[in-house]
């Protein structure tokens, strides 16, 4: 939902982010990077904690190191098992978590 806000601790305090502005989240050791349309945030929350906070059906844990917002997916490269995002970035998909069919079903639902 558009009103869904998420609060993340940062080095200097905390940030309030609209869930729908998050493109993807990436694990960085025990920390995480939250990438939005216009900014990147660094938080002490783990990817699992972020996954538990984001209770939005538009987000998929596609890899042990990535959570992606379905609204920003442009295409899937099955030869590389990567998703291309509308931001121009490419992120990996775990072939142990997803078959091509399961990925299509998950993205379409």
Predicted regions and their residues:
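Basic, polyanion-interacting recognition surfaces, primarily
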Residues: 1-109
């Amino acid at each position: 939902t558009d009103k869904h806000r998420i609060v993340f601790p940062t080095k200097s305090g905390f940030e309030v982010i609209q869930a729908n502005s998050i493109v993807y989240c990436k694990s960085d050791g025990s920390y995480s990077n939250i990438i939005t349309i216009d900014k990147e945030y660094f938080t002490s929350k783990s990817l699992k904690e972020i996954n538990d906070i984001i209770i939005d059906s538009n987000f998929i844990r596609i890899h042990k190191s990535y959570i992606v917002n379905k609204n920003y997916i442009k295409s899937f490269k099955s030869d590389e098992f990567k998703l291309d995002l509308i931001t121009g970035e490419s992120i990996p998909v775990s072939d142990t978590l997803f078959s091509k069919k399961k990925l299509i079903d998950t993205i379409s639902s």
